[in-house]
Amino acid sequence: MKQGKSNTRKAVKKSARRTTALGRTSKGFTAEERAAMKERLQELKAPKGKGDGESAVLAKIAEMPEPDRTMGERLHAIIKASAPGLSPKLWYGMPAYARDGKVVCHFQTAQKFNTRYATLGFSDQANLDEGGLWPVAFALKELTAAEEARIVALVKKAVS
């Protein structure tokens, strides 16, 4: 019996490990996750003021590599036009749009976490509920007129 308890304790003490793309195991956060947390800490320490969010978001979009930059510029224009009540701000280093200081939606570049697509995500503040199951993030490979129309509808519903 004591031997069983010992094995259980050892199993509990082991930390979660994940395998990286190179086949190595690592503990904790990825470099991208740590960078996002550092950006969030800087955002929280930054002085607050009207208009600061818009300029910070536009500056962040300008830093993005293509095609994320063009997509970010277009999304910014779509979200501002569809929901003028949302305030742009940075959130974990990503362009985000908030109502009363709470993020409703955000844009994550493909480059941010080395994924094959960018993401338009919505928080629990967004009114997108549809029964017991609904999407809260959408993969973006390109923005055609069809995708733009869907985003307009999603953003309007999110703030309704």
What spans do the regions from the language model cover?
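Charge-dense, helix-prone N-terminal extensions
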Residues: M1-S160
